[in-house]
Amino acid sequence: MATRKTTRRRRVKKNIESGVAHIHSTFNNTLVMITDMQGNAIAWSSAGSLGFKGSRKSTPFAAQMAAEAAAKASMEHGMKTVEVAVKGPGSGREAAIRALQATGLEVSAIRDVTPVPHNGSRPPKRRRV
């Protein structure tokens, strides 16, 4: 039998100096995606993709690790400055922003883009613990 040769596309090194870091922080996970100014994805990471499972995904430390991984991957493409767009009520918001600054990316602006309903669907009932 002939084995099929699998070809893997090489990652093209883009030369992008500024972009947007989208931090989506939920109660269960934190996702960090770094895009160029037009919105094309350059690098992304999440707490779950780094091996955190269950309730450990929702910790600030997991958000910090996800932000570091995404920042390092984007710096390979020449990223130097980012605007930060934070979405969601999760615990990893501030930790992810601090981690982006600690890796050497210059944060030029921080925006909160959490969607606020104009009385949309009914929210889930309050937890009684």
Curated annotation (Swiss-Prot):
The keyword Transport does not apply. GO terms for biological process: translation. It holds the Pfam family Ribosomal_S11. GO terms for cellular component: ribonucleoprotein complex; ribosome. InterPro entries: Ribosomal_uS11 (IPR001971), Ribosomal_uS11_bac-type (IPR019981), Ribosomal_uS11_CS (IPR018102), Ribosomal_uS11_sf (IPR036967). GO terms for molecular function: rRNA binding; structural constituent of ribosome. HAMAP family: Ribosomal_uS11. Part of the 30S ribosomal subunit. Interacts with proteins S7 and S18. Binds to IF-3. This is Small ribosomal subunit protein uS11. The lineage of its organism: Bacteria, Bacillati, Bacillota, Bacilli, Lactobacillales. The gene is rpsK.
